[in-house]
A protein has these predicted regions:
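Alpha-helical transmembrane segments in multipass membrane proteins, preferentially the mid-helix core
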Residues: 146-155, 211-225, 267-280
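Aromatic-anchored segments of alpha-helical transmembrane domains
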Residues: 15-23, 105, 126-129, 170-186, ...
Length: 348
């Protein structure tokens, strides 16, 4: 799977994330916030699509991270070169710090109750230990841990044969389920140690998708599937049909995030086949800005403007407005980073 395809999939995932955070809140069902169509059990389609399908975005991001770092390992680490994980994570933190520098002062003005002037709290949010400033950052610290340890994790995975792969799959699946269950038990934001423990449990929960992404690299799953589908004259139709079937199948199941485990790799695989050899500039644009949009969009939904975006009433209109303002903000942030990142990298 090439960079263009990965970028397009990231573009799809960030759009899913924005829809998720707009419509997964059951408090909006009273009809005063936005117009909606009922689906079943008295809940709107926008909610079911968000909660059941769009909530797959984070596991899918982590899958792509495992896949991408697996590719980097095979290209660089095996020849003794650095994977650049330290620089990669540092640049992500710089991006976060720029966003905090922009949005926290704005938040202190518009929503001072939510943004107290605590230096400890500021440091915790700058490192990802706390996500009090923006709950959408919850998987920042788990990602940093996975990325920084990826060289050793991937080296461990690559040394096994088929039997070892089966054992590792079952072991990491059990660890992921344990992490998912444990998050609810330790999710206490009042103590820094509990916040660290929550981040660790989130990392354990996400580790299986990270592992599966690496396994796709180890066994060339996507490349083999693309080559196999190339023998069919209607490969695009088949892969599109697979995506539609997977979406419908997921909508017919429960809300548990554990259900994403089998669906996420299949969705990514189907999208990789569907988008292979294509260059959709629209999706690539959102893929390029996906990190910034992840880090900023929730400010516009709740933390600063306190749900004012729902004044637009209609789900598609609200969604397009959030996408537009998040994208515009991302472009501004990229302009700032053009000056900030080189200066900081020179000092290191």
């Amino acid at each position: 799977m090439g960079k263009d395809t990965t970028l397009q999939i990231k573009g799809i995932l960030i759009l899913m994330m924005l829809w998720l955070h707009l419509y997964s809140n059951e408090d909006l069902f009273d009809g005063t916030c936005y117009e909606f169509l009922y689906w079943f059990n008295g809940k709107p389609f926008s909610y079911h699509f968000a909660k059941k399908f769009c909530s797959m975005c984070v596991p899918a991001y982590i899958f792509l991270s495992g896949y991408g770092l697996g590719k980097v390992y095979c290209k660089k680490a095996l020849s003794g070169q650095s994977m650049g994980n330290g620089k990669r994570c540092f640049n992500l933190y710089v991006r976060l710090w720029v966003i905090i520098a922009i949005f926290v002062p704005i938040g202190c003005y518009f929503n001072p109750e939510h943004y107290p002037y605590s230096m400890l709290e500021l440091v915790e949010n700058m490192t990802g230990i706390s996500t009090y400033y923006n709950g959408a950052w919850w998987f920042l610290l788990p990602y940093i841990i996975l990325a920084m340890s990826s060289r050793y994790f991937i080296r461990y995975i690559m040394q096994f044969g088929k039997k070892g792969d089966i054992v590792n799959t079952l072991m990491l699946l059990a660890i992921s389920v344990f992490g998912y269950v444990a998050i609810a038990k330790v999710n206490d934001s009042t103590d820094i140690l509990m916040r660290l423990l929550t981040g660790l449990m989130a990392m354990l929960y996400l580790s299986f998708m990270f592992f599966v992404g690496i396994m796709f690299v180890k066994h060339n799953v996507i490349e083999k599937a693309i080559n196999r589908m190339a023998t069919f004259s209607n490969a695009t139709r088949y892969s599109l049909a697979a995506v539609v079937v997977l979406i419908i199948g997921r909508l017919c199941m429960g809300n548990s995030a554990l259900i994403h485990i089998p669906f996420t790799p299949l969705i990514i695989l189907s999208l990789a086949i569907l988008l292979n050899g294509k260059s959709n500039k629209f999706l690539q644009l959102f893929g390029h800005h996906s990190t910034n949009m992840w880090l900023v969009h929730f400010f516009f939904i709740t933390y600063i403007f306190d749900g004012q975006i729902y004044i637009l009433r209609y789900p598609i209109v609200i969604f397009v407005a959030l996408v537009a303002i998040s994208l515009a903000t991302s472009k501004i942030i990229d302009r700032i980073l053009m000056y900030v990142q080189p200066l900081l990298n020179k000092r290191l």
